[in-house]
Amino acid sequence: MDTDLSDLLALLDLTSLDDDLFQGKSRNIVGPRIFGGQVIAQALVAAARTVPARTAHSLQAYFLRPGDAREPVIYRVERIRDGGTFSTRRVVAEQRGRPIFDFAASFHNAEDGPTHQTAEHGAPDPDGLADEQTVTADFLKDEDISENFRAALLRRKPVEIRPVTRRHPLRPEKAEPIRQVWLRAAGEAGDDPLIHQALLAYVSDLSLIHI
């Protein structure tokens, strides 16, 4: 199913049920199971709602059970610690009273500190690169696959992704475990830093399973 940016922003608008308890809507993005990126993004929003003055700087997530895209998700936030400059939160996502996902994040005051990133590999300007849908369509034009599968691979996403290296979606060649892409929201995402972080959390699972 296609997902516009407006659809994703609606998914990130959680309902507060009680102190540290939130509910998120679900959407059929990759079939009957909830797309993992949706749960990561919603869990980040739930945790951040309890730390309004700090910004997430690290997180880790564990998928415990498949989620049902036909049902909402309950997010229980546990306030592990609030220190002088850091806060730690744990979030458990539940459906039908059972945990489907476990999440932890650390939040930090805005201040200078050490930063780490991989070296820049001389990526070309994005204006000269094709978007992922165009690249995928070119690879699939001679593939004998069902139209439903083809449509799933080519469906619209809430972010525009422009890969630096073209990679076949069905038969990728052996390569180093590094992927360079340019990406941006496919529309106006506003100025809230939390929403931008949640969009990145959502996108993280797009690349992991290459959909």
Task: Give residue ranges: language-model regions.
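Non-catalytic linker/capping segments at the edges of enzyme domains
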Residues: M1-D20, T118-L194
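Conserved small/polar residues in nucleotide/adenosyl-binding loops
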Residues: I209-I211
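Small beta-barrel nucleic-acid-binding modules, principally OB-folds
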Residues: P52-P66
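N-terminal, Lys/Arg-enriched amphipathic/low-complexity engagement segments
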Residues: D19-V51, A56
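Intrinsic-disorder/low-complexity, polar/charged segments enriched in Ser/Thr/Lys/Arg/Asp/Glu/Gln
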Residues: D19-Q23, S58, P72-I74, D102, ...
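HotDog/MaoC-like acyl-thioester-processing domains
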Residues: I34, Q42, G67-L140, I195
